[in-house]
Amino acid sequence: MTFNNKTIEELHNLLVSKEISATELTQATLENIKSREEALNSFVTIAEEQALVQAKAIDEAGIDADNVLSGIPLAVKDNISTDGILTTAASKMLYNYEPIFDATAVANAKTKGMIVVGKTNMDEFAMGGSGETSHYGATKNAWDHSKVPGGSSSGSAAAVASGQVRLSLGSDTGGSIRQPAAFNGIVGLKPTYGTVSRFGLIAFGSSLDQIGPFAPTVKENALLLNAIASEDAKDSTSAPVRIADFTSKIGQDIKGMKIALPKEYLGEGIDPEVKETILNAAKHFEKLGAIVEEVSLPHSKYGVAVYYIIASSEASSNLQRFDGIRYGYRAEDATNLDEIYVNSRSQGFGEEVKRRIMLGTFSLSSGYYDAYYKKAGQVRTLIIQDFEKVFADYDLILGPTAPSVAYDLNSLNHDPVAMYLADLLTIPVNLAGLPGISIPAGFSQGLPVGLQLIGPKYSEETIYQAAAAFEATTDYHKQQPVIFGGDN
């Protein structure tokens, strides 16, 4: 059997009843990965040997009947450290880097009995919105292999959407979980900043980065967040977990819930069919008893400019550690120390990474700091205040996840600014440190349209409540790409 149509709870019941073993489930998952990998290129590393060792140990210890994730396979984005498994951030610079520790999120998942089956492809160092900047080649969209899967967590999204795995981890700096979730028709959540430890995450923008879950359904997504969320002394920005169970409100009705619909999220640059889909979703929420009203987030239009100054500045600082000396790629043609630095970085980093390093270095340079980085920080505060004003009166914000559906591979490579604008609707959430989810809300041109729900800090259970209410009364999440197939 392939098991790819079974929910996590159904798989758990099979494991507890011993109808299948963790080893059998892991072997079936590995076969699912291999059979689809040529079409998708969603993995950098398939950790077959390590996964089977983990599965055997779980079978010998026995499945934990009280833990729904015991024995469940998990794919992990390649910028999240995994003990003994290559972690390259999809870059030539880290082509041979094998950590000797697990990221806290991975360690937490393993503590729950989850089995790491591989590392997923991504935009290099999480810098990209299309899944095309990877040193290991572009990932393909699960619905149409001529389209981008979104980025930067391209492989994590495509792997879940295609049925390679049921659950995966990604990271979100400016939309890198939500946008690929939207493009692939699955559920992806960026938690509140600090909810999931960043220890072991290869840093891009440290004030923006957050690890989060991908799953086919809202409840499965919440179950994975339950496993990975924790306060962590190794991450000074992590926060105490305020919610014991992120699934606690799933199944409750949303009568009287106040949902804001920002006019800026449906304005210029939004595909007409995407706009229509979101307006129909808003009407659906009203049918479920929610109150949906138009609001304004006036400073959101500056989000992309603010983000690319702040994120690139933080990246230029974070990536200084990759110098060809301590680990990773070292240029062989260097004759002195300066050449080792220059050549290793020139050859080890891809074009998009180098572009952002240069942009960030410029923004932080003497004479330009006040005009760019400092000003960006001030506008970031205005964006945060916009959200605070709305959340004083509303429970959630509703809008599209992306301005369009997935676009053609290689169509925006020549125009980085156009690609940056694809994150227009997700970036403000990261700038404000808020939680946001993307769920399937319809189709345009045969491709999934994502609906984004945003909440105030630490409101994940309310986001899941509303998302689950929408999911329970629609069928969009049940539709699968051809590559998904079904149970044998």
From Swiss-Prot:
Extract the Gene3D superfamilies matched here: Amidase signature (AS) domain
**UniProt key word Signal:** no
**What organism is the protein native to?**
Streptococcus pneumoniae (strain Hungary19A-6)
According to the UniProt record, one GO cellular component term is: glutamyl-tRNA(Gln) amidotransferase complex
Q: What is the official name of this protein in its record?
A: Glutamyl-tRNA(Gln) amidotransferase subunit A
* InterPro entries assigned to the protein according to its UniProt record, in alphabetical order: Amidase, Amidase_CS, Amidase_dom, AS_sf, GatA
Which reaction(s) does the protein catalyse, per the Swiss-Prot or TrEMBL entry?
L-glutamyl-tRNA(Gln) + L-glutamine + ATP + H2O = L-glutaminyl-tRNA(Gln) + L-glutamate + ADP + phosphate + H(+)
GO BP annotations of the record are: translation
Q: Which gene encodes it?
A: gatA
In alphabetical order, the GO MF annotations are:
ATP binding; glutaminyl-tRNA synthase (glutamine-hydrolyzing) activity
* PANTHER family xrefs: GLUTAMYL-TRNA(GLN) AMIDOTRANSFERASE SUBUNIT A, TRANSAMIDASE
Q: Which family does it belong to?
A: Belongs to the amidase family. GatA subfamily.
Query: What residues make up the catalytic site?
Result: 77, 152, 176
Top-level enzyme category: ligase
E.C. numbers: 6.3.5.7
The annotated subunit structure for this chain is: Heterotrimer of A, B and C subunits.
